[in-house]
Regions:
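A polyanion-binding, active-site-adjacent surface
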Residues: 7, 19-167, 171-174, 179-180, ...
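Polytopic transmembrane helical bundles with strong interfacial aromatic enrichment
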Residues: 204-205
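Short, contiguous pre-domain boundary segments
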Residues: 10-14
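Short, Lys/Arg-enriched N-terminal segments with co-localized hydrophobic residues
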Residues: 1-4
Length: 224
């Protein structure tokens, strides 16, 4: 019998999302996810499913970057969207993100794709779907994760002020309606994927725009 995963998650998030833990959809989701981890290769590692929340406590969030679902190749996904661990080759989208940061802010290209240094500064690196089957992009979409992460976005929108939400690509942009635009800055552009980066991701200046907004609202800018 499937029981709710004992969700270990940062305390501020645990409270902000209190109504999720006993919700029927979440029980169903955790039953599904637990079973898939037993039967197949699932990414990220089970102890990293909620890594984005743990790395960026609820009351420390300043910027939200929304991804779709985790990388599905061996050793890539680490629970933070777009991020890979040191020593893992940077995926093309991440290289394009660093190119835009370099062009926008002058920051040099980093040695690796580990974005935990952003998370430590208050950047929530949130995938809409938090798990995926090896080599099958999108395989855990529509199982309940999107409900959970939508509620996380809504909780931030409602309970925090002057955050920056960065939405790249049509999927992320579809989450714009969850956010109160009068309380927060919402930045949108095409996705950094090589398929779309030249259609307006490059030159979007999102990193400097985010920092300008944070500074205007008395918050420490992010060292991108």
């Amino acid at each position: 019998q499937a029981t709710t995963m004992n969700v270990r998650i940062e305390e501020g998030w645990k409270q902000a999302l209190a109504s999720e833990w006993e919700a029927p959809y979440f029980e169903q989701l955790t039953g599904f996810v637990s079973e898939r981890y037993r039967q197949a290769t699932i990414y990220p590692p089970g102890n990293r499913i909620f890594a984005a929340f743990d790395a960026c406590p609820f009351d420390k969030v300043k910027v939200v970057i929304l991804g779709q679902d985790p990388y599905h190749g061996p050793g890539q996904a680490n629970g933070l969207c777009f991020s890979v661990n040191p020593g893992i080759a940077m995926p093309p989208s991440l290289i394009n993100i660093f190119k835009e940061i370099h062009d926008d802010t002058g920051s040099p290209m980093p040695a690796d794709g580990d974005l935990s240094r952003w998370a430590a500064q208050g950047v929530l690196l949130l995938n809409a779907t938090l798990t995926v089957e090896a080599h099958q992009a999108g395989s855990h979409q529509g199982k309940g994760w999107e409900t959970f992460t939508d509620h996380a976005i809504e909780a931030l929108s409602r309970n925090r002020e002057n955050l920056v939400f960065i939405l790249w690509g049509s999927y992320a942009k579809s989450k714009s309606s969850l956010i109160d635009h009068s309380r927060h800055l919402v930045l949108t552009s095409p996705h950094p994927s090589p398929l779309s980066a030249h259609r307006g991701f490059f030159g979007n200046h999102h990193f400097s725009l985010a920092n300008d907004y944070l500074a205007r609202n008395g918050k420490q800018p992010i060292v991108w």
